Amino acid sequence: MCRAIAVALIVYLAQHYILAHAEVIASGRLEKCVVDGVTEELDCQEKVVVTLTVGNGQSLQTEALEFSLSCLNSPDGRCPCSCSAADPTCACRDLAAPLRVSLTKSPLWASYPLQYLSSFNWKPLEVILRPSNKVCKDGDWEDSPTCGWFSQGGVRVADSQGFCCECSSSQVWDDTFGSSKERTRANLDCDFWSDPLDILIGRKPVSAHCLTFDPQWYSGYELGAASLQFEIAITVEVPTAPSPTTATTSATPRTNNSSSANSTNSTNSPAPQFLSPPAPSTREVLHLGPSVPLASSASRLLSAKLLGDLAMYTQLPAISNQVLMVPQPPAAAAATGSPLDATLATNRSAWMLLDKTMLSMDGLACDKVGTGFSAFRYQPSGCGRAPQACLSGQLKDLWEADLARIADGRVPLYMITRFTGGSDTTLQSFSGGPLSFALPVTSHSQSLVTLSVAADGVRLVTNRSPGKITGAAVCRFAGTSCGGFEAVAARGYIYVNITNTGRLDSDYTLTVSNCSSNVRPIEARTLAVRAGSAASLDPPMELYVEDQAAAAARTCTVSLYDSVGAVTDSLTLSFYTNATQLVVKPSGGYNGTGDGAGVKRNGTDCSTACTNPIDVLCFVTKKCWSKFGRLLGIIGGALVGLGLLAVALKFGWLASLAASCCGGGGGAAAGGAGGGMGLGTGGGGGCFGGGQQQQQLPPAASHAMSPPQQQQRSHAEVAAGAAVAGAGAAGAAAAVLGAKHGGGGGGARGKQQHADTRHLQDRDSRAIDGGASIGSSSAGGSSSLSSYSQPREAGGRLLQPPAAAVFVPEGGGGGAAGDEGARAQSSDWDARGRSPRVADEHGSPRQRYDGVRQSPYMVSANPYDGWYDGGSGGGGGGGGGGYGREAPPPQGPPPHPVGAPPPPPRRRSLWERMWLQRPGGGGGGGGGGGGGGGGGSGGGVDQHGGRSCADAARRGGGGPGGMRGVEGLMSNGGRPNGPHPHAPPPPPPPQQQQQQQRQRRSFLESLTAMMTLPWGGGREEEAGGDRRGGGRGGAAAAHGGRGAGGGRGHPPSIGSPPPGPLQPPEYGPQGGQARRWGAGGGRGGVGGDGGGGGVGAAAYVQLSTGGRGGGGGGGRGRGGGREGPTWHNPVYDWQAPPK
């Protein structure tokens, strides 16, 4: 029953007392029982339970609840008291006045907890220095940089030394010629003429940029979640005087302005109610709040409980996780002991509230609060920016921006006074600590409180007093100006003053309604005003409009309601709004629409559009730059390769590696001389060719030789005390590949005859059994390392090997001499008509080697060339062909003084070195039968020379070998068909020549020489000579070339002086001049031996021991001497000076 009454009362009060500040939600009598668990008896009491609301604007005791009590402490629970008050043992007392309870509520605050983050400077500044000595130091390891170091706890702060800027070369150029449009951070004068001397020596204008701090610092505190803070005070007044015995009501009623609501029901018409007369009483105040929601009076007559708050109309500001900036006390105040709390508590208007995105907690970001040394030092393009760049957006900048907004009538963005309308007094009224932060809550907030009182009944008494609106205005933030504001960009603040014109403290409700269009509704506010006093809204009401238009007159009605909801005063409030001032848009720049983004090309488009890899026009038109670049790369690579090839040829790197075939045939008693090293001539007449075996002379003839003759012979021999047969000359061109050599002489098939009886021998096709070989010519070809370490004389020059000579392997054996009267049959030729395979049993042809293409079978110019019998002059066992460059024959003897030392060497020209060597001529033909005819010389580069030699030998006379071959001699010592038949022989050179200066190899040449494998031997050629091959072995000896033993085709008669040199002692590999060598060899017998092969050169031009000649005797030659290498070093190629 009681619950039903309470619900009906709540509905009634909600409909009729919605504007009341302390509204009773429910009230009724209720028997409350308590069980303590000690006993099963219930402690029950009948109480009046009242649930009411308390608003946040109810700060004065303008309402009171009066609980009627007949007596107190009645022993039997009945009133009036059954005992007498005069009885000292009677505790029951009848009350003269009701129990009075009033409730008030403090202002409501939204409090935010604080958490310290860091300290932030008020305004970091840049200091610019211009060192007088134009030296700026900003290194990380500088002890004394120009800006100095900051320290923190005795440790240097990284990057606190600032940075330096100087004029660049381009800035000096631009400033000098007046075309500079760029700035420098310190506005440096980069003109060259400002200080030309210093700029010339590299001391350009320079500036140092240092970071310093303002003395004022702020502490940053992060805001936590908001909580509501308020306090409800319950004042309980208990009367102490007993009630009078007379009537409870006075005969003369007193009326007042208070209203009363009685919770007791009566069937009779309500009697007039009067305010209870004041009576002596005791006062007790109970406090309720979110922290302590329960309280009871000392007499246990009343208990109170805070149930909670109803929802507000306006939410709290969403500023959690923002940072509150609180100024720190100055250092002077801290040093004097000024308390921080007092400083902060009296300076809350300087507090600022910032979002975290505006801060740099680590100091690495520019233009943010907290910018540090690293951000300042490493700012992008620091030297090209304006001074103080990277230092904007600091606390001072934000504060000044807020002041500018306030001056324009706008609300600040960072000051915390934006929540109070610019009033600082509201912030100071918060009762929290000095580092507490709370914002006032102006929205309606109703707290539910339940009171339980042991009373018979209750009534609510509310003060009602008239009020008046004394003033109202719409102003801008902080009241800078009134009358209106800027629409949307700002908001208006309604300031209202009211006065309580009654005699009681009363509550009032202020509303703003009936506004013009597009004015946002405004929430009502409540005030408690003392009797006869005036009050103002603090903070003021906020007024928003919802358009950007300018309006001269907008209106709203301001009404004042009293405590019971009656309008006690109202007025019309007029204001204006200005149009919103939008940010000015930038103008200028490009006014067109542009061409838009292009279509991206990929590799697939180019591959389908340009299929020709060399279609340059397609590449350019289709913009296939990758393919165009690829083509340019290929062409460029080829050109670079050709350039490197030219350089290699110029310096002899490639030419010294180019293989050439210089036969190593043997110059033996019966065969032609060995092939040379390929500097120009053919085998028998090869330059530096194989040695020609010396003819053993009778003792008388030997003793009859004059000293010049013996000295002439000694030029070709260096081995002490040894009659060296077939001594070969080392190749003149210094090949970096190491030793390449020809073959030595092969074994004899017939016995060699004496020179005096050689012409008596029959010229048949059988082999003549002869005697032993002459001298040391019986063994195969060989070479010795010791011979390389000795100076050798060749061509009138004294050569000296380098200190570290490359070992030259032993020379190969030369081929055996051919028989008399033998001729090649048609079956000896292969199916393709090529010459018979050379080296029947002894030689091993090589398929090919680098630099020279050579087939296993040499091709003769005439496929039917063969051997001739001894009578006709069979082909001698000539050496392999040279590998040289064709040159025209000389026209006359060279004008060189007789007996003079050879001219100094010179390098060949680039054109000469770039021209690849061509194959040299064939080997020399064999001598005529019976020794009657002189042997032909080795062939030159043309094929005619070798053949003519063979033909001449068959006819019994020698013939010229070729352009550069030494002529063979006829039996009478003549030189048929020679280049200079009438040239007088020059005297022999002196025995001692001045040693040429040694030329050391480069590292590349030495490395190549050590790492290159030796080349294999070559192969013979037929008697006709041809380009590379040597001739076949013949019956008679021939002068097969210019070996060390080269000379006459047959020895002179005993006692006759030896012939002189055939040509002047000049060396000209490109001029085709004959070279001068030692004394001529003896004539070979019928069916003589194969000649010993000449050895190849080492790394430099030097002589070496030639291959040894074979044994004497006739018989068909089984194989010629092996070919020597064709390498030569064009860098060290000697050539006669230009004529």
From Swiss-Prot:
A GO molecular function annotation here is: lipid binding
UniProt xrefs under InterPro entries: HAP2/GCS1, HAP2/GCS1_dom
| Biased amino acid composition, Pro residues | 887-904, 978-991, 1054-1067
Instruction: State how changing residue 366 to A affects the protein, per the record.
Output: Decreases expression at the cell surface. Decreases ability to mediate gamete fusion
| Basic and acidic residues compositional bias, start-end | 753-767, 829-851, 1018-1029
Q: What is the effect of changing residue 372 to A?
A: No effect on expression at the cell surface. No effect on ability to mediate gamete fusion
Q: For this UniProt entry, what is the primary localization, expressed as one broad class?
A: membrane
Q: Where are the transmembrane segments?
A: 631-651
Against Pfam families, the record matches this protein to: HAP2-GCS1
Question: Residue span of the signal peptide, if any?
Answer: 1-22
Key word Cell division present in the record? no
Keywords attached to this entry: Cell membrane, Cell projection, Cytoplasmic vesicle, Disulfide bond, Fertilization, Glycoprotein, Lipid-binding, Membrane, Signal, Transmembrane, Transmembrane helix
Q: Which GO terms describe its biological process?
A: fusion of sperm to egg plasma membrane involved in single fertilization; protein insertion into membrane
Residue ranges annotated as Extracellular topological domain: 23-630
Q: What is the effect of changing residue 662 to S?
A: No effect on expression at the cell surface mating structure. No effect on ability to mediate gamete fusion
Give positions of region: Disordered.
241-283, 689-719, 741-1139
Q: Is Nucleotidyltransferase there in the keyword field? A: no
| Residue ranges the record marks as coiled coil | none
Q: Which GO terms describe its cellular component?
A: cell projection membrane; cytoplasmic vesicle; cytoplasmic vesicle membrane; plasma membrane
Q: What is the effect of changing residue 391 to G?
A: Abolishes expression at the cell surface. Abolishes ability to mediate gamete fusion
List all topological domains (Cytoplasmic). Answer: 652-1139
**Other remarks on this protein:** HAP2/GCS1 family members mediate membrane fusion between gametes in a broad range of eukaryotes, ranging from algae and higher plants to protozoans and cnidaria, suggesting they are derived from an ancestral gamete fusogen. They function similar to viral fusogens, by inserting part of their extracellular domain into the lipid bilayer of an adjoining cell.
Q: How does it assemble?
A: Monomer. Homotrimer. Membrane contact and insertion (via its extracellular domain) into a lipid membrane probably triggers trimerization.
Query: What family classification does the UniProt entry report for this protein?
Result: Belongs to the HAP2/GCS1 family.
Q: What is known of its domains?
A: Both the cytoplasmic and the extracellular domain are required for normal trafficking to the cell surface, and thus for fertilization. The extracellular domain can insert itself into lipid membranes, probably as a trimer. The extracellular domain has structural similarity to class II viral fusion proteins.
Q: What is this protein called?
A: Hapless 2
Organism of this sequence: Chlamydomonas reinhardtii (Chlamydomonas smithii)
Q: Which gene encodes it?
A: HAP2
